[in-house]
C-alpha cells in the first residue's frame, strides 16, 4: 500500500511540445557553404517561454525558420536534425503537412511589422485570411472574430480600425495587429522574432506585457528570439545563447543571470547599459563574429574573448556543449570558461 501511494505521487517527466535535436542548416552560395546553424538542440514545454539570444548573424532566426520550412531552398538546405512537434518531425514533414501546422498550431511574429503587413490590403483582409485557410471561416463570422482579436490586443475602436490600412497605424499598433494575426487561430506555439526591436522602450514594454497576458489567457508556449538579455531576463524561463551558429550556453534564466559561465554570455551581460555606473565607458565586445563560410576547428570566440582567458582557448578542435552543472550547459572551452 505504501508503494502504491508513493507511485501515485511520482509524476512522469513533462513531454516537450517541441523537441529540436541537432538541427543543422547551411546555405550553399557561390562564395561557399555558409554554416548558419550547426547541431542546435533545444526543447519547449507546454506553457513555457524560452529565449534564443545572440548577436545578429548568430543563427537565431534561421533556427526557427528551419522548423517551419521558411528557409528558401536553394540556397538553404537542412542537412540534418529532428524537430518533433506533437510527434510530427517538422524537418521531414511534407509541405502539405507543414501548411496545416504553420499559421494554425505554430504562429510567428516577425521583426518589422511594416514590412510583414501587406500595405495594399486592409487589416480586415489580412486578419481573416488565416481563419479562412485554417478553419474555413468566412464572411461576418470571420470579421467578428477578427474584431475580437484586435480588442484582445488593446486596439481601441476595433470595429472601425479593422477597415484601415497598415500605414494608418503607429509602429506599436502595427505590432499589436501582428500579434492579433499570429494568435487569431489560437496556436499552441508562438515564435516571436525580435517582436519589440523597432519600438521605443515604453511601447516595447507594452508589447511584451501583452504577449505575457495573451500567453496566460491561451496557455501557449513562446520562443522569444532577441539580442536583448534584459528582455530575456524578464520574460523567459529557459535561455539558449547562440554564437556563430551554435549554442554556447543554455540554462534556466535564473541560473544563467546569476552564474553565467561562457565568456560570450558574460560579455553580453557586461554590455547591458544598466550594469554600468554613470560616467563609465560602455563595454562593447571587440571584433566581429567569424566568417561562417569557414567551418572552425577551434574555439570560434577566441579572437574576441577579453572576459575569459583567450590564451587557453581551444586551437586544435571545436568545443562541445557540455553539462557543467545540473541543467546548466556550456561549451567546454577552457579559455571561455576561465
Where are these predicted regions, by residue range?
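Short catalytic/signature loops enriched in Gly
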Residues: 14-16, 33, 156-160, 250-338
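Conserved ABC ATPase signature
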Residues: 164-169, 173
Amino acid at each position: 500500500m505504501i508503494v502504491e501511494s508513493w507511485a501515485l505521487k511520482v509524476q512522469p517527466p513533462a513531454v516537450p511540445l517541441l523537441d529540436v535535436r541537432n538541427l543543422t542548416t547551411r546555405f550553399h552560395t557561390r562564395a561557399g557553404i555558409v554554416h548558419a546553424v550547426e547541431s542546435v538542440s533545444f526543447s519547449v514545454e507546454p506553457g513555457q517561454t524560452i529565449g534564443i539570444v545572440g548577436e545578429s548573424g548568430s543563427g537565431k532566426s534561421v533556427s526557427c525558420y528551419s522548423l517551419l520550412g521558411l528557409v528558401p531552398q536553394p540556397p538553404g538546405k537542412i542537412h540534418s536534425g529532428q524537430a518533433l512537434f506533437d510527434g510530427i518531425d517538422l524537418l521531414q514533414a511534407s509541405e502539405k503537412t507543414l501548411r496545416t501546422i504553420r499559421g494554425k498550431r505554430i504562429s510567428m511574429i516577425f521583426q518589422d511589422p511594416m514590412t510583414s503587413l501587406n500595405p495594399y490590403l486592409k487589416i480586415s483582409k489580412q486578419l481573416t485570411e488565416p481563419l479562412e485557410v485554417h478553419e474555413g471561416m468566412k464572411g461576418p463570422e470571420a470579421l467578428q472574430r477578427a474584431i475580437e482579436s484586435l480588442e484582445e490586443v488593446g486596439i481601441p475602436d476595433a470595429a472601425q480600425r479593422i477597415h484601415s490600412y497598415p500605414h494608418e497605424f503607429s509602429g506599436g499598433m502595427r505590432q499589436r495587429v501582428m500579434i492579433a494575426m499570429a494568435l487569431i487561430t489560437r496556436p499552441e506555439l508562438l515564435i516571436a522574432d525580435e517582436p519589440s526591436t523597432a519600438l521605443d522602450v515604453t511601447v516595447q514594454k507594452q508589447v511584451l506585457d501583452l504577449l505575457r497576458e495573451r500567453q496566460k489567457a491561451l496557455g501557449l508556449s513562446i520562443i522569444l528570439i532577441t539580442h536583448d538579455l534584459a528582455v530575456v531576463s524578464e520574460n523567459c524561463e529557459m535561455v539558449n545563447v547562440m554564437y556563430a551558429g551554435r549554442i554556447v550556453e543554455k540554462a534556466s534564466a535564473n541560473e544563467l543571470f546569476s552564474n553565467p559561465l561562457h565568456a560570450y554570455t558574460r560579455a553580453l551581460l557586461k554590455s547591458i547599459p544598466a550594469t554600468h555606473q554613470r560616467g563609465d565607458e560602455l563595454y562593447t565586445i571587440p571584433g566581429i563574429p567569424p566568417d561562417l563560410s569557414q567551418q572552425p576547428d577551434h574555439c570560434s570566440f577566441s579572437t574576441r574573448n577579453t572576459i575569459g582567458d583567450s590564451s587557453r582557448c581551444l586551437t586544435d578542435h571545436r568545443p562541445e556543449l557540455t553539462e557543467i552543472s545540473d541543467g546548466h550547459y556550456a561549451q567546454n572551452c577552457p579559455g571561455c570558461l576561465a
